[in-house]
Amino acid sequence: MEIDCMKTRDIIHNDKILARYIPATEAWGSSDLSFFSQDEEYIQAGSWNYNKGKKLLAHTHNEVERSVLFTQEVIYVKSGSLQAYIYDDNSILVEEITAYADDVLIMLSGGHGYEILEDNTKVLEIKNGPYLGAEIDRDRLNLDG
């Protein structure tokens, strides 16, 4: 099923959030600070939209031990477009999403893959760490069986 929507929405399968799609109009349309992640999610993603002169209070982040069981990632499409394929934990395709310039995708669980739709598509990918290497951090989906 391919969805091409203009509102932030969760891709849910069997009561589990697999991904979150934030179109450009919502990612960058609000004023102030807007977070798209839930507090309990391993990765936190939000956007700023402030006017000149806004000052953000200087701060540090406290050392806090956290238990992180999965790698989650955020994809920001800077330019071009891509097709995102969202899979459940059993490698079953649940949904396809077309993402365009300035759209954001948060991959929370299950599997995913991408197809670049335009030349010179530029994407910023952000993941939680530490990175333990491809052999430990990920499994390739067997989509033939």
Describe the function of each predicted region.
Residues 113-145:
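Double-stranded beta-helix
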Residues 47-69:
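Conserved short histidine dyad/triad with adjacent acidic residue
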Residues 1-52, 143:
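A short, N-terminal "cap"/entry segment at the start of jelly-roll beta-barrel domains
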